Amino acid sequence: MLSLLHTSTLAVLGALCVYGAGHLEQPQISSTKTLSKTARLECVVSGITISATSVYWYRERPGEVIQFLVSISYDGTVRKESGIPSGKFEVDRIPETSTSTLTIHNVEKQDIATYYCALWEV
């Protein structure tokens, strides 16, 4: 087992913010990654068409308030929180699998957090 100096644990929990009949699920409960590697977290949408939604990703670090990270709108426009290093987070939406993925590049100790996905039906 690697020590905390070599790994970061990314806890993943689902947050449901849907207006309508959709359902949101994060199938991966937790993820442990080696520092400086890439982590990918998925959010699966059912009950509605993902391309008719905007998906938002947030994180909550231990002892801190929830922070908006990045979103992808129904038209594919990506919006990122100011102050977050460029290239740190990527978001995509895959209509064929009704999935949104948050990619975290160069995992650091500061990335230890609970990550939430939410969606807004257009």
UniProtKB/Swiss-Prot annotation:
Main localization, broad class: membrane
GO cellular component: external side of plasma membrane; plasma membrane; T cell receptor complex
Disulfide bonds: 43-117
PROSITE patterns found in the cross-reference section: IG_LIKE
GO molecular function: MHC protein binding; peptide antigen binding
A single GO BP: innate immune response
Keywords: Adaptive immunity, Cell membrane, Disulfide bond, Immunity, Immunoglobulin domain, Innate immunity, Membrane, Receptor, Signal, T cell receptor
Signal sequence extent: 1-20
Keyword presence, Cell membrane: yes
Domain Ig-like intervals: 27-122
Subcellular location: Cell membrane
Subunit details: Gamma-delta TR is a heterodimer composed of a gamma and delta chain; disulfide-linked. The gamma-delta TR is associated with the transmembrane signaling CD3 coreceptor proteins following the stoichiometry: a single gamma-delta TR heterodimer associates with one CD3D-CD3E heterodimer, one CD3G-CD3E heterodimer and one CD247 homodimer forming a stable octameric structure. Upon activation, gamma-delta TR complex associates with FCER1G to initiate intracellular signaling.
Entry function: V region of the variable domain of T cell receptor (TR) gamma chain that participates in the antigen recognition. Gamma-delta TRs recognize a variety of self and foreign non-peptide antigens frequently expressed at the epithelial boundaries between the host and external environment, including endogenous lipids presented by MH-like protein CD1D and phosphoantigens presented by butyrophilin-like molecule BTN3A1. Upon antigen recognition induces rapid, innate-like immune responses involved in pathogen clearance and tissue repair.
Protein name, entry field: T cell receptor gamma variable 9
Source organism: Homo sapiens
